[in-house]
Amino acid sequence: LLKDFNENEILKMVKWCADNNFKQTFIEVMPVGKVDLQRSNQFLPVSFAKEKIKKAFGLDPIFFKTNGPSRYYQTNKLNNIIGFISPLTNNFCSTCNRIRVTSNGILYPCLGDNGSTNLIDILKFDDNKLSQKIRRIIFNKPEKHFFTVDDKTYITNRYMNTTGG
């Protein structure tokens, strides 16, 4: 979700996804990497989208679980499922089960942290040691991220497109 960019297309996206039997997820912009713009001007909380969708189509929370951080809702009038990921307004770190591995072999246990391990360096270990090392990295994931929506703070030195989400 981006303020002044796609906030007026939310209902169109919901309708299109419902008409084409797609599930969709709305995600708050994550302050990842240093950018030359004012993040606070772009920030749009998922509550904005939820309220807009609720007024137009009805919206109720449902028990629908995947392996990701999305919280799911169902529209009453369209009967489609919509996910919401809110790293800033409703931190989900306590249930995060994700790690990311880049194409050049760097393992990042958290999107909101610069901590990383070069897997290429540990591939020389036997499978048991490699497995132990990766398990240790996962076990020591940061407890939470420190994302903010101010214009001065950026948490990581890398951008989302280099890490994957």
Annotated model-derived regions:
Residues L1-D36, E51-L59, T102-N104:
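Conserved C-terminal portion of the radical SAM core fold
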Residues N6-K23, L78-N90, N161-G165:
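Short, electropositive alpha-helical surface patch
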Residues I138-G165:
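Short flanking/linker segments adjacent to small metal-binding domains or redox-active Cys/His motifs
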Residues V32-T148:
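Accessory C-terminal segments flanking Radical SAM cores
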